[in-house]
């Protein structure tokens, strides 16, 4: 266990949403937690995932849509996404997503997971990521600058180490629910529902 909207639909939505190139956020802003849902939701899921992890893709494509519909979009649960890259390519993709403006973050990782087999297996993965970044409004020069930002790269690595230290995360995806439940792997929606249904009562 390193552990779809149809792809065309996702790509078109991505392009139409972000046609204007934007200045990347500061390092501090780039490293801030990315929260899906209402920040004040009573229940918190912390997700540790790698953008090159096939099981993480499975969760985002098959399970997350149902979690969003039932719990996240209804204000009952928020999901905090934390990068846990296992390899240099996963780290590179994480840097790219973090260099997008925060309101574009989940759109970026949605496309990265949907197209994972394309860019992660490409003979020229950097160029493949650059193309995705351009579709999302990230200037290639800014992407390269972000990759050279040692504070950003080191900060992402530190988040992985913090996950290992604080929650004994050693595989992706790993989910910590309110600090007292752990789910490891791309478990189906029903496994999350068993825990969340009790917490939101």
Residue ranges and their predicted role:
Residues 30-31, 114, 178:
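Residue-level signal for pocket-adjacent positions within structured domains
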Residues 35-36, 119, 183:
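Short clusters of hydrophobic/aromatic residues that line enzyme substrate/ligand-binding pockets
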Residues 36, 40-43, 91, 103, ...:
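Residues at secondary-structure transition points
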């Amino acid at each position: 266990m390193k552990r779809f909207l149809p792809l065309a639909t996702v790509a078109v939505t991505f392009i139409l949403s972000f046609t204007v190139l934007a200045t990347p956020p500061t390092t501090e802003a780039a490293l801030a937690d990315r929260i899906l849902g209402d920040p004040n939701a009573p229940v918190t899921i912390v997700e540790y995932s790698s953008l090159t992890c096939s099981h993480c893709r499975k969760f985002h494509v098959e399970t997350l849509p149902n979690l969003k519909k039932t719990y996240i979009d209804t204000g009952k649960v928020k999901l905090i996404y934390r990068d846990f890259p296992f390899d240099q390519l996963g780290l590179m993709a994480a840097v790219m997503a973090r260099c997008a403006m925060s309101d574009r973050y989940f759109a970026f990782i949605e496309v990265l997971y949907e197209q994972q087999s394309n860019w992660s297996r490409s003979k020229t993965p950097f160029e493949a990521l650059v193309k995705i970044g351009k579709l999302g409004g990230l200037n290639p020069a800014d992407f390269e600058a972000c990759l050279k930002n040692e504070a950003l790269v080191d900060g992402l690595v530190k988040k992985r180490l913090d996950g290992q230290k604080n929650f004994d995360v050693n595989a992706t995806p790993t989910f910590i629910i309110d600090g007292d439940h752990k789910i490891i792997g791309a478990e189906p929606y029903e496994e999350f529902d068993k825990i969340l249904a009790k917490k939101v009562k």
